[in-house]
From Swiss-Prot:
The keyword Chaperone does not apply. GO terms for molecular function: beta-galactosidase activity; carbohydrate binding; magnesium ion binding. The record marks H358, H392 as: Transition state stabilizer. The active site is at E462, E538. The gene is lacZ. Keywords: Glycosidase, Hydrolase, Magnesium, Metal-binding, Sodium. One of its GO terms (cellular component) is beta-galactosidase complex. Na(+) binds at D204, F602, N605. This is Beta-galactosidase. Substrate binds at N105, D204, E462, E538, Y539, A540, H541, N605, W1003. InterPro entries: B-gal_small/dom_5, Bact_Beta-galactosidase, Beta-gal/glucu_dom_sf, Gal_mutarotase_sf_dom, Galactose-bd-like_sf, GH-type_carb-bd, Glyco_hydro_2, Glyco_hydro_2_beta_Galsidase.
């Protein structure tokens, strides 16, 4: 039998997507009492088959022996289900060196020849024994449900073929009733790594295989509920509700259904209705279906802010009114519509604070547990996200249940992407693939229909545009008129989308690509005849050290009502845990498993690291998206305005806390409750008079809105919003200075003052030694610094085998920034004034590219005052930084001693990503100043610093700084954090100016021009003590 089944090669026939698979439906549990269904108790009718299975591997399905159907093979090993076999420690797949995790963004991981896939098609053979209760065998129907198998599989039970399925992200359900026997039953599942379905699953993610979601058995009585779709409706005033229930029953003649709606423990609506419908057409009515409505006066509404849920139970009753089985669903009363060019929930226009989320676990790959899903969603809620896009496939069922309960809007997306096709829409225009396309959305809608959190259906991602999408759109709009549909392919504004949903369109700049232009956002919504809302399905590419310019998007969203937000790309770095040869853990990306083709670290685009530790960029997103506006109105008296962006919630759990600070020291503080209606505002006077601030001081007002009580997603004292408002202080007067003592040497100058002694080298013009209390502070001379270890956004290309000549790294290399030759052009020493002035030239060949003038003032109190002018040649590109580098000795910072600074913090920040980095007096251990991005780059900058205390060294002025055990050169050469080796000493970068990091995308020059360091003149200064 196995030979005949394999010989059919269903897995490379696009017209065959399944054989004997049951129709898709909403989740079923077959509770045998209405009370159990109401209380969501474990159902005895459902049994999990997760756990240890047996596993054998073959290089192709044709090599699997026939007798595997009835007995395990000698080489079979234990394997965990759910799991990806490439990540299972017991997997003996080293026999096929290419069967490893593969990361590729666009390219198919095999030759592109649809619907054919390679003959060398890794095949996993899963098996296990199970038994079922005797009463299951006696009557009713026993089903098996595979929640997710990648990419296709044949199912056998007790040596007999049951069926076939593909589409790795939706359930495959089969009727096992006729295959079962008493005692032990044997399941055998032949899983193929590649299938024609793989051409439709070309998402930007790791490609791995296996039974990666749960497997379960479900027993249903002979007469049972087959499918139930629940549609909440609100009247035109969004006050009263009605619940439409459409259901289908097997063998339903003479039966009836009882529906009960509960609000907590209170029953609020009931009805009983016989199975059967009114006449549908001239041929009559359905005898296995029913439609009914529950009227509910003034129900509590569901939204992401107020996720109130009712519980609906449906009980199938026999002719005598006795219960047969019950099903139940969480219900949220909410209305989704597009009206007046705006996406609305319950009449109010939304602002989508969204994230794209892949299902990814650092250890188990595509296997995500309910606890891990909850961790992600709680982090999102705590960082002011209100929406999640299931990119790019239907998710684990638990995600939707939790979004219903915690309060997050969901874009549910079909498992469809053909990014690697040329043209991208090739398959969408081929009628032979139409059914495969359509089925991907119809089955998703069937499974997820009842979740109130789902407010938008998505037809998939990056699959071009063709008649298949029109068919998908038309089917969804007919099957579910209660939700809009979106689809980005074909230019983001085709007839197959209700929402303009571009990816990586910019606030300020047109990108006129052929066939699929991306207009500047405000321009797009103003195009003639365009009335749809615009919501970015992807924006702010958070790859490594990124998210520069994020605040500009949020200013645009608030300035233009039809710009209704978007979904950051993306939530988590898709790094996988791997060991170095010497046993150290690191996060692997494309190529680290020997996988080809690969797109390197392009899988690491997250706001959180693989272990869910936040990137510094996550704090920027939280601040930009916060649901309150806080504005300083007047200084005398100190008056602020608070504006709520909540659409549905009153501020019943929010208090305002405020602090008045001078140079980081709190001089006054207080708090008060907030009583704001939804979208309301209020003014508060905090102080009648401001205190007098010291001359030259930094003074500011910190405002924070906190929740005094815990919520289902936050702890006591959770901070929802924060704002810092600068306050004026008198200017300080310059202090008279006394020059230090100068001693001329043969090759330089020695300067002594207080506890410090410096040596200037005549040949280089640089400070090459600095002793304090007899201890050397420098490992090499202080020098100009113009380079940074390239960021992912600087590298600028997502393709592993293409260089991008317009990328910043390429432009810097072309300009010779990596090979500048230094010459001291002149040095003028004025001992009586305590001043040394040096001109430095930086050349590529004979061409002068950079000219700097360093004015050193050495004071008797031990201070070296630096005033630095920089002239950048006209032909140079924007520089990454303009500053100075100091390689300090280890003695500068004692073991365990912390670094403190007065400036922006506490987390890493850059000139175009500092909205959330408040001024303060911060302290941090040295190692915390280093941000360990999966792919090492420049990191750890702190901007707008006035004072830096680094052990024995103090720096004053206005500068940015970073401090690391690793040089920029080592960071530039490393590929993983485990490649970094402490070089001895500390690398201190003091920057007068630093170019932005960008982040609109990671494959073009995404740094906004106002954050470039253009050719021209620059001046900065600082004081070293």
């Amino acid at each position: 039998m196995l030979r005949e089944i394999v010989a059919r090669q269903d897995w490379q026939t696009q017209a065959i997507t399944a054989v004997n698979r049951l129709p898709a439906h909403t989740p079923l549990f077959s509770w045998r009492s209405e009370a159990a269904a109401r209380d969501d108790l474990a159902s005895p009718s459902r049994t999990l088959l997760d756990g240890e299975w047996r596993f054998s591997f073959f290089e192709a399905p044709e090599l699997v022996p026939e007798h595997w159907l009835v007995e395990d093979l000698p080489d079979a090993c234990a394997i965990k289900v759910p799991g990806n076999w490439q990540l299972d420690a017991a997997y003996p797949g080293l026999r096929l060196a290419t069967d490893v995790p593969i990361y590729t963004n666009i390219k198919y991981p095999f030759p592109c020849d649809p619907p054919r896939v390679p003959a060398e098609n890794p095949t996993g053979c899963y098996s296990r024994e199970f038994s079922v209760p005797a009463d299951w065998l006696a009557s009713g129907q026993t089903r098996i449900i595979f929640d997710g198998v990648d990419s296709a599989f044949h199912l056998f039970c007790n040596g007999r073929w049951v069926g076939y399925s593909q589409d790795s992200r939706l359930p495959a359900e089969f009727d096992l009733t006729s295959f079962l026997c008493g005692g032990d039953n044997r399941l055998a599942v032949l899983v193929l790594r590649w299938s024609d379905g793989s051409y439709l699953e070309d998402q930007d993610m790791w490609r791995m295989s296996g039974i990666f979601r749960s497997v379960s058995l479900l027993h249903k009585p002979v007469r049972h509920l087959m499918d139930i779709r629940v549609t909440p409706e609100l009247d035109a005033c969004y006050r009263d509700g009605r619940l439409k229930i459409a259901l289908q029953a097997a063998n339903g003649a003479g039966l009836s259904v009882a529906a009960c709606l509960y609000d907590g423990g209170e029953r609020v609506a009931t009805l009983r209705q016989p199975i059967g419908t009114q006449a549908i057409d001239e041929k009559g009515a359905y005898d296995d279906r029913a439609e009914c409505w529950l009227e509910v006066a003034a129900p509590r509404k569901w939204s992401a802010e107020t996720p109130h849920l009712y519980r609906l139970t449906l009980t199938l009753l026999d002719e005598q009114g006795e219960p047969i089985e019950s099903e139940a669903y969480d219900v949220g009363f909410r209305a989704v519509e597009i009206r007046g060019g705006l996406l609305r929930v319950n009449g109010q226009p939304l602002l989508i604070r969204g994230a794209n989320r892949h299902e990814h676990d650092v250890a188990s790959g595509h296997v995500v547990t309910p606890a891990a899903i909850e961790q992600d969603l709680l982090l999102m809620k705590r960082h002011n996200f209100n929406s999640v896009r299931c990119s790019h496939y239907p998710n684990h069922p638990e995600l939707y249940r939790l979004c219903d309960r915690l309060g997050l809007y969901v874009v549910d997306e079909a498992n469809l992407e053909t990014h690697g096709m040329t043209p991208m829409g090739r398959l969408a225009r081929d009628p032979a693939w139409s059914n495969a396309f359509l089925e991907r959305v119809t089955r998703m809608v069937a499974r997820d229909f009842n979740h109130p959190s789902i407010i938008i259906w998505s037809l998939g991602n990056e699959s071009g545009y063709g008649p298949a999408h029109d068919a998908m759109y038309g089917w969804v709009k007919r099957a579910d008129p209660s939700r809009p549909v979106q689809y980005e392919g074909g230019g983001a504004d085709t007839p197959a989308t209700d929402i303009i949903c571009p990816m990586y369109a910019r606030t300020h700049q047109d990108q006129p690509f052929p066939a699929v232009p991306k207009w500047a956002l405000a321009k797009w919504i103003g195009l003639p005849g365009e009335t749809r809302p615009l919501i970015l399905c992807e924006y702010a590419h958070a790859m490594g050290n990124s998210l520069g310019g994020y605040a500009h998007y949020w200013q645009a969203f608030r300035d233009h009502p039809r710009l209704q937000g978007g979904f950051v790309w993306d939530w988590v770095d898709q790094g996988l845990d791997k060991l170095t040869d010497d046993g150290r853990h690191f996060w692997a990306y494309g190529g680290d498993f020997g996988d080809t083709p690969n797109d390197r670290q392009f899988c690491c685009n997250g706001l959180v690291f693989p272990d869910r530790t936040p990137h510094p960029a996550l704090f920027e997103a939280r601040r930009a998206q916060q649901p309150f506006g806080l504005t300083l109105l007047e200084r005398q008296p100190l008056t602020v305005e608070i504006r709520s962006e909540y659409l549905f919630r009153e501020t019943d759990n929010e208090r305002l806390q405020w602090r008045l600070c001078e140079d980081g020291v709190v001089v006054s503080q207080g708090e008060c409750p907030l009583t704001l209606a939804p979208q309301g505002s209020m003014m508060l006077t905090l102080l009648e008079r401001l205190p007098a601030f010291a001359p030259g001081a930094l003074a500011w007002l910190d405002l924070a809105i906190v929740q005094p009580a815990a919520t289902p997603w936050s702890a006591v004292g959770h901070e929802v919003a924060r704002q810092q408002c600068m306050l004026p202080a008198p200017l300080s007067l310059p202090v008279a200075r006394t020059p230090a003592t100068f001693i001329e040497l043969a090759d330089g100058w020695q300067i002594r003052a207080a506890a410090s002694e410096w040596r200037l080298d005549k040949a280089s013009g640089r400070v090459q030694s600095w002793c304090k209390l007899g201890r050397e502070q420098l490992k090499e001379a202080i020098a100009d610094h113009f380079y940074r270890a390239p960021l992912d956004n600087d590298i600028g290309t997502s393709e592993a085998d293409h260089a991008d000549p317009n990328a910043w790294i390429a432009r810097w290399q072309e300009a010779g920034l990596n090979e500048l030759q230094h010459r001291c052009l002149d040095m003028v020493v004025s001992p009586d004034q305590g001043v040394v002035t040096v001109h430095h030239g930086y050349f590529v060949g004979d061409a002068l590219k950079l000219l700097t003038r360093w004015r050193h003032e050495f004071d008797q109190d031990g201070a070296m005052r630096l005033a630095i002018e920089v002239q950048v040649a006209a032909e140079m590109p924007s520089l990454p930084r303009i500053g100075a580098r100091l390689w300090l000795t280890d003695e500068v910072l004692a073991t365990g001693e912390e670094v403190s600074w007065l400036g922006r913090g506490p987390h890493e920040n850059y000139p175009d990503r500092l909205l959330a980095a408040d001024l303060g007096r911060w302290q941090s251990p040295l190692d915390v100043l280093h941000t360990a991005y999966v792919f090492p780059t420049d990191n750890g900058l702190r901007c707008d610093t006035r004072q830096l205390q680094l052990g024995s060294i103090e720096v004053e002025g206005l500068f940015h700084f970073s401090l690391s055990r690793f040089s920029q050169q080592q960071l530039a050469q490393a590929r993983h954090q485990t490649d970094l080796v402490a070089e001895g000493g500390l690398h201190l970068c003091l920057d007068g100016f630093h170019m932005g990091i960008g982040g609109d995308d990671s494959w073009s020059q995404s740094v906004r021009p106002e954050y470039w360091l253009q050719p021209g003149g620059y001046y900065w200064n600082c004081v070293l003590r």
